[in-house]
């Protein structure tokens, strides 16, 4: 029995509860893994899931995919949350030879045709699937096609909107913003553009098939020398010759 004297009006002393370490750790991990979105401001932030968008006084729009024809279209984006509601609005960004690849939710790369039309039908990578992201400052970016040297542009005609690579210069219609997930941001690390690396899975994805050990070595060497595109073309020609020869 406790011999401590108590008086009327005294506040009850509450026993301190031990913190549940596991519960706290779980909460921290959950918070770290939540897909919070933020605008990209540096080149080394362009990795992982991303939303390419524009916003004006009327509404927000983002680059997206039309699932049946696999062409690129504009999709509405909530101008307040700036968060995608459809997987068709999200592209997976990766780096190749100081250029950027944009893979859609369909698992295919965004390409630019000679006429400037955009589509996502290619599983292998060539110059048409490679892009240069130019940092314009203040959160704005311009997307330049490696194959056509033209910029991704939003055009408006009356109530219709369309996208294509048609501009030779960075006009206002060619300025975009990019949303990325905070968990993919690289802190205190050198840019991937300064230290490019490539993995076997990436090479097989670009080649569109499984690769032998020798083929991987050849392509990795070509990547380091900056001639991967040419090496991939040679590989495809060789594969066709073996198939029909």
From Swiss-Prot:
Localization (cell): Nucleus, Nucleolus
Any one GO BP annotation for this protein: mRNA cis splicing, via spliceosome
Region entry Disordered, spans: 1-32
Entry keyword set: mRNA processing, mRNA splicing, Nucleus, Spliceosome
Record-linked InterPro entries: Actin-crosslinking, FRG1
Statement: the UniProt record of this protein carries the keyword Nucleotidyltransferase: no
Pfam families noted in UniProt: FRG1 (PF06229)
GO cellular component, one term: nucleus
Annotated coiled-coil segments of the chain: none
SUPFAM superfamilies: Actin-crosslinking proteins
Metal-binding as UniProt keyword: no
An MF annotation (GO) of this entry: actin filament binding
Subunit annotation: Component of the spliceosome.
Reported function: May have a role in processing of pre-rRNA or in the assembly of rRNA into ribosomal subunits. May be involved in pre-mRNA splicing.
Family, as annotated: Belongs to the FRG1 family.
Protein's UniProt name: Protein frg1
Organism of origin: Schizosaccharomyces pombe (strain 972 / ATCC 24843) (Fission yeast)
UniProt gene name: frg1
